[in-house]
Amino acid sequence: MPEPAKSAPKKGSKKAVTKTAGKGGKKRKRSRKESYAIYVYKVLKQVHPDTGISSKAMGIMNSFVNDIFERIAGESSRLAHYNKRSTITSREIQTAVRLLLPGELAKHAVSEGTKAVTKYTSSK
């Protein structure tokens, strides 16, 4: 008689699974793969609740988020260096977003970022 199927882990979940080595008996941890998959999935469900995403598309979205993050971080770092500052503040991030993103997209990103920072500071 076939065994009942176990429930699959949530998409994008990151768990360190321990495996036992054959001869040595020592436990080995599987390396964690960090990704934005769970966050991309949450946003997708907010925008289109009945739509799914393939693993290939999720990989592309993960690469996209990593790329944008690196660009904003790099530009923010450059701005802080130009102004002889050792700290990247929300002001540097905002300016970097304005420089990197075109027109209306930058305006929306800045307003969403401001909203997120306001929500965070009010919750403290």
UniProtKB/Swiss-Prot annotation:
The modification N6-acetyllysine is found at residues 6, 11, 14, 19. One of its GO terms (molecular function) is structural constituent of chromatin. It is found in: Nucleus; Chromosome. Residues 8-17 have a biased composition (Basic residues). Glycans are attached at residue 111. InterPro entries: Histone-fold, Histone_H2A/H2B/H3, Histone_H2B, HISTONE_H2B_site. Monoubiquitination of Lys-119 by BRE1 gives a specific tag for epigenetic transcriptional activation and is also prerequisite for histone H3 'Lys-4' and 'Lys-79' methylation. Phosphorylated during apoptosis; which facilitates apoptotic chromatin condensation. Core component of nucleosome. Nucleosomes wrap and compact DNA into chromatin, limiting DNA accessibility to the cellular machineries which require DNA as a template. Histones thereby play a central role in transcription regulation, DNA repair, DNA replication and chromosomal stability. DNA accessibility is regulated via a complex set of post-translational modifications of histones, also called histone code, and nucleosome remodeling. This is Histone H2B.
